[in-house]
């Protein structure tokens, strides 16, 4: 059995970007993001998790806690499993918005304690990866492919298990994320 909890983000202005970005960003295609994602994950582990545990029978072990998300949520899932690894043992990161804060992610994956029992699933679709011209074959060279593969390699170097999946013909949309999550 599994309990799945969906978290609604703010919809006014740039609230979603601020809530789902764990690092402050100034520039690039996002413009400015305040980066309160760390507060969001802290709220999940310190408050939301407790509410769920009071209402439902749960296992309190990190091995029973996973986090998943797509796009900015994929970035948050990766951040959570790295920075809050004492709470989360697994993460599904679908079409993660990684590009604008990659140096911060690399820093965290190199410096945060990561349990060897950590499993991370990274996915994307060929139709969302810039530079891919043949959408009938797996993408092995786009920027999106390279950054997901490099994060997987960093995680593996730290003893974690990392799986990557490129959905041939996949787009940056919920219908394709529904297909990608099946590999998790």
Residue ranges of model-derived segments:
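Non-catalytic cap/lid and distal C-terminal segments of serine-dependent acyl enzymes
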Residues: 1-184
